[in-house]
Amino acid sequence: VILGSAGMRIVTAGDMVCFAGISGGLNVSIKNDYNITVLRGQSVSEILLSPEKIGYTGIESPTVVLALSDEGVARRQKIFAALSPDTYVLKEASVAIPGTPAQVEELDFKAMKIKKTDWALASLAVLAKHEIVLNKDMLVFALKSRFNEKLFNLSMETVDKLI
């Protein structure tokens, strides 16, 4: 689950996770939640990756939560208390999250001089570094599949800062 705000490229990051999953031979499902008002409000992507056929697309207990904005967290705040201790939460330092039994890693993307519009991509790079859900090869495949050469190279600059 990716929790962000409008303009943070959350839907694009969700697409990247799907492309990465497909490259790994997985079945994928994505649901996006965002306001129709341009550049306002929450942006949330719920992604399922499974080696099995996906019948039910609801997420009851996510494996990973990327908490990148207060607006996104507010939209899905109830999930935090129900997360398992095995769930990995990556939280941007400026974002407050409710109490959770999950494993929480905090990163300060602003201090790393990563633009807010690249926080979602940076989070995927962290997942790839830790080999949680995806690895670097899967992420690179996804970026190459989705972007032209110029955008791919710009994206890789962000990825390389974190891997």
Where are these regions (language model features)?
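Active-site cofactor/cluster-binding pocket
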Residues: 1-163
